Regions:
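Bacterial N-terminal signal peptides that target proteins for export
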Residues: 1-8
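N-terminal signal peptide c-region/cleavage motif recognized by signal peptidases
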Residues: 17-19
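Boundary of Sec targeting at the N-terminus
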Residues: 22-25
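Short acidic, flexible loop segments centered on an aromatic residue
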Residues: 48-66, 106
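Intrinsically disordered, low-complexity Pro/Gly/Ser/Thr-rich segments with frequent PxxP/GP/PP motifs
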Residues: 65-97
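Terminal connector regions
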Residues: 92-130
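Short, solvent-exposed loop/turn segments enriched in Ser/Thr/Gly
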Residues: 35-42, 97-101
Length: 130
């Protein structure tokens, strides 16, 4: 029994760094004032994993419907323990305000054992000033 408990404890401690390291993006929320027909946000997707991942950036409205935003770059590979800036330009579409979700999605590489698609989204609020 004591041996089983020690083994379970060792496994739990050994797996903690795996569970703690999760795909991330910063910032996760923000408000932007703009004097033009669009507002811009710079986000930083990060890869905490030990191998590279393929990343796609998408922009959605509050109901998770796609928004026609300009994203540069929108698809890229992110190395292990790396982060990179991504510029997102969101049109107001004639409105004075716009709430969007900017999402980082990791895409599994083909022929790999794990085929999980992870998504993390931040909330951003644009205000058009006149």
């Amino acid at each position: 029994m004591k041996h089983t408990l020690n083994l379970a404890t060792a496994l739990a401690v050994g797996l903690m760094p795996i569970a703690a390291g999760a795909q991330s993006m910063s910032p996760m929320r923000g408000e932007v004032n703009s004097f033009t027909d669009a507002f811009a946000v710079r986000v930083f997707p990060a890869n905490p994993y030990g191998q590279k991942i393929k990343v796609e950036i998408h922009v959605y409205d509050q109901n998770f419907q796609p928004v026609d935003a300009k994203i540069s770059p929108n698809v890229f590979q992110l190395g292990s323990q790396a982060s990179r800036p991504v510029l997102v330009v969101v049109p107001f579409g004639g409105a004075a305000e716009r709430k969007v979700r900017i999402c980082t999605e990791s895409i599994p590489f083909p022929n790999q054992q794990t085929q999980i698609k992870a998504q993390i989204c931040g909330k951003f609020f644009g205000h058009r000033k006149s």
